[in-house]
Amino acid sequence: MKQINIGVIGTGWCGGIRTETARRNPLVNEIHIAETNEIRLHEMAQLVGAKTATTNYQDLLKIDSIDAVIISATPETTHFPMARDALNAGKHVFLEKPIAIELEQADELIALAKKKNLKFTIGYSQRFNPKYAYVKKAINDGTIGKPVSILVSRHITRSLGKKIAGRVKLSPAAMESTHDLDFVFWCLEPAKPVKVYSQVNYGAMRESTGGDIPDTQWIMVTMDNGLSFVVGGGWSLPPGYPNFSSTWIEFVGTDGALMVDDSHKDVVLNTMKNGMQLPMSTMPGEQVDHIYAGPMAYETVHFIEAVAMDREVLVTGEQARQVMEVYMAADLSAETGEPVYLPLPTEMLKAANG
């Protein structure tokens, strides 16, 4: 059995999950980590027995024995330079979404990975959620026939929304609905998006932060086969809401309908101290004693296996770029009040990039 050595850049919430998952995997020999928070760096190094622990990610790229790098760093503006440097160093790369901030950056990463013959994948973890995988299967095997109506609505709590929105100027489309856009495009392959219309709604987030941050964003996407669908996302659930993330999915086809309640109401905890809570309701998931509840561990194992066993990755750079172009178009549409046609013209790309 071939073992590989993994480097993890950024060991916060998601990076920590991926680091611990790698530590438990028999295909992984050594773990090397880079983290700018020295307290967290020391904590994770002790927890996983890291071979290298550094505050400078470039140190990992100089280690020839590292086969692959997982980039879980924030803010999102760091994604492109870190991924570019890792690919140039000859490392296979797993990169958290978004793939980049500008489409030209995404194109450069995709081309570089191909040139170097390296695995390059993006963290769209919901593809590894069994409920979502079931929807994909039901479409592929014809259970519900040809899709004619699709709706996905996702909302997270206000406290988590402030944390995410405060990192970088990205919209609910870019930071929340991005997962659902990827999911629907995956289900509808090989159809491609050709038109995007979007509107945003303001309220609690702008009032509480003072920034130009919408509470919700709704997106209608038209595909090249004529089908249109709606994706909505927001981050303003009340602070007392008992879970982190709540999602509703509708797929109606010519031969059936499939509804998915991913609001995490299946396990309800109520205590005198904290009131009602819905455990295991985060999008990445969480460790529960001996087992991991959620998609992120499966996703991490998938990448490790792809590198160690030379398998194809499930999420390609091209697919992540497509999602990025659509949420950029959604933001432009919300700003102008008009539909936006794809591919995005050069002048619109310049406007989107400020």
Where are these regions (language model features)?
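NAD(P)-dinucleotide binding in Rossmann-like oxidoreductases
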Residues: 209, 224-298
